[in-house]
Amino acid sequence: MDVNASKVDPKLLELLVCPLTKGRLSYDPEANELVSEKARLAYPIRDGVPIMLISEARKIEE
């Protein structure tokens, strides 16, 4: 996969919120995930598409 293809459009990032908390998300380029610090969840991005399902999110351990 092209490295640039996995980047998240900043405008999309402004629109997306955590489905659990409705809070802001940040992009983690190393893991290619959208992270909700408040919910302690990381949502995967697959083939350039954010998967915004709580059931698909990875729990962030401390």
From Swiss-Prot:
Span of the signal peptide:
none
| Gene3D superfamilies from the UniProt entry | 2.20.25.10
Instruction: Determine the domain of life of the protein's source.
Output: Bacteria
CC terms in the record's Gene Ontology section: cytosol
**Which residue ranges traverse the bilayer?**
none
Q: Which family, according to UniProt? A: Belongs to the UPF0434 family.
- The protein depicted here goes by the name UPF0434 protein Smed_3047
Organism of this sequence:
Sinorhizobium medicae (strain WSM419) (Ensifer medicae)
